[in-house]
């Protein structure tokens, strides 16, 4: 049979669990957790693609970014600098702090034409 836990032991266990949850919550909110993503990556420029400058998320485009969380700002700037598209900051009740806008790329024309099939003559 298991020994009954005293209320002091149960309170101590509950306190430790709550402290651990609070620590994890602070780490997530502060953006301290490093996911190993290199934010200094260079993006290859495609030929024929116009170069666009995306506005800084912290500027408050249309007043949208003024109430954005620091985590959203920290995710917006490196993401917008490492992709081919750009992002539009927005105020959303669903947690979408910015929307991706990706360029529509036209397929490359085929420069190598396949030769027509010729019948084999057996004589």
From Swiss-Prot:
Domain of life: Eukaryota
GO biological process: DNA repair
Entry protein name: SOSS complex subunit C homolog
Pfam short name (any one): SOSSC
Membership in a protein family: Belongs to the SOSS-C family.
Any one annotated GO CC term: SOSS complex
């Amino acid at each position: 049979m298991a020994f009954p836990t005293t209320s002091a032991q149960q309170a101590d266990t509950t306190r430790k669990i709550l402290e651990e949850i609070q620590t994890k919550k602070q780490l997530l909110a502060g953006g301290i957790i490093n996911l190993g993503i290199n934010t200094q990556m260079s993006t290859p420029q495609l030929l024929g693609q116009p170069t666009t400058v995306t506005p800084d998320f912290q500027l408050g485009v249309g007043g949208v970014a003024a109430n954005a969380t620091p985590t959203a700002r920290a995710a917006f700037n490196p993401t917008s600098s490492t992709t081919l598209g750009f992002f539009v900051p927005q105020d959303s009740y669903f947690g979408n702090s910015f929307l991706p806008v990706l360029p529509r790329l036209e397929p490359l024309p085929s420069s190598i034409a396949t030769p027509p099939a010729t019948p084999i003559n057996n004589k």
